[in-house]
Design a protein with these regions (language model features):
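Negatively charged, low-complexity tracts enriched in Asp/Glu with abundant Ser/Thr
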Residues: 1-42, 49-92
Length: 92
């Protein structure tokens, strides 16, 4: 069964908002890409920031056709973890 448009938008908004927050409040860069032809949102997390030629990153592919909720929750948990770690850096 196809996911409803409203739910897709809700998931995409949540990811983009969190990606902006992580990119603004930490040393990490988070890229978000929507691929309509395959119905997924791809999230790439460059720990320590993006640099030319840097190929090491964490990737989450949230497919709206399968395993959406599990991957979405894992992605959001990782982004929240990075924010929490950044907050703890200020306490040192």
């Amino acid at each position: 069964m196809a996911m409803e448009t409203e739910r897709k938008i809700s998931i995409a908004k949540a990811i983009i908002e969190k990606a902006i927050e992580v990119s603004d409040k930490t040393k990490h860069d988070v890229f978000v890409d929507w691929a309509p032809h395959v119905q997924w949102v791809e999230v790439a997390i460059y720990l320590g920031g993006w640099k030319t030629g840097k190929n090491e990153y964490e990737k989450f592919t949230i497919s709206f056709n399968r395993n959406t909720e599990n991957v979405f929750k894992a992605c959001m948990a990782r982004l929240n973890e990075l924010l929490t770690e950044a907050g703890n850096d200020f306490c040192d």
